[in-house]
């Protein structure tokens, strides 16, 4: 996708509009039983819950536990759903697909009068439109949406397998709608964009199903970059990816929890592998454009928020944690970055400079 705002706009729209979907009544469900974090609070289906049975006569029962996904909050434990498309799951699915239709329609509305066609954008080759940053953006956006939908389906009583299948299918279908819309613009639809969407959706849903979503994560960030003045005179197509960075994160907190070991202060850090491009998207292409990969050590902002009492038992807590799991905060990492064009390594400031 070129003319539209790619994965970032699609994910932002999805998070805002999906917040309107909520079930008709509070339910409870055992979410991710192997994880000891706040997000996994709950008890297995069929457990009556400690809150309902005081240990001794006269003891005040503990308040019921709650779990929120954006603005939908439920009381744990939740009974299994009697059908896959109950009211809550149906609303989330319909809203997700509705977002896809709305985003898909924006391109043809802005640039009407074009017949449908596909283009071969390829993936991460040097001479592609965005050097692969567009595909990384699609991947991360779809992984994030699949993660969100999976959680939403779980708190509406769906099983792990049902949540995996439905979140994967709905996210891929959203990507398909968007590419159909792109196919009716001057830029054309892209099978490579849809492939990146499908891979991201699968990994996002699979990480949630496998219970290791607290170990790996994906972030998209803005990196303010001063581009050369000469680029200001060259027409630009779509997004300027010179101001974006894409991260694959490995979280020490989750690793420690799964190993049943306290990582200590390392809990508040994460190891990231970054991908970024500079100078792409111009027409005609500029010779100075380049691609970089990097290794970073950065702050795990959601884990820091949890340490000060933010959790997913409130709508604002869950929304805040999700926002910082998706958005990479600038200047909270140090790293080294390899430039494929110059074949040189650069220091922590590389994402913010155009070499």
Tell me what each language-model feature is:
Residues 2-12:
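Bacterial N-terminal signal peptides that target proteins for export
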Residues 24-135, 139-146, 150-158, 258-263, ...:
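N-terminal targeting leaders of membrane proteins
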Residues 151-157, 205-211, 250-261, 301-307:
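Outer-membrane beta-barrel proteins
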Residues 176-198:
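Interfacial helix-loop-helix junctions of multi-pass membrane proteins
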Residues 202-203, 246-252, 295-301, 336, ...:
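Residues on the lipid-exposed face of transmembrane beta-strands in outer-membrane beta-barrel proteins
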Residues 216-218, 267-273, 295:
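Transmembrane beta-strands of outer-membrane beta-barrel proteins
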Residues 222-226, 275-279, 301-303:
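Transmembrane beta-strands of outer-membrane beta-barrel pores
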Residues 240-246, 289-293:
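Residues that define the transmembrane beta-barrel architecture of outer-membrane proteins
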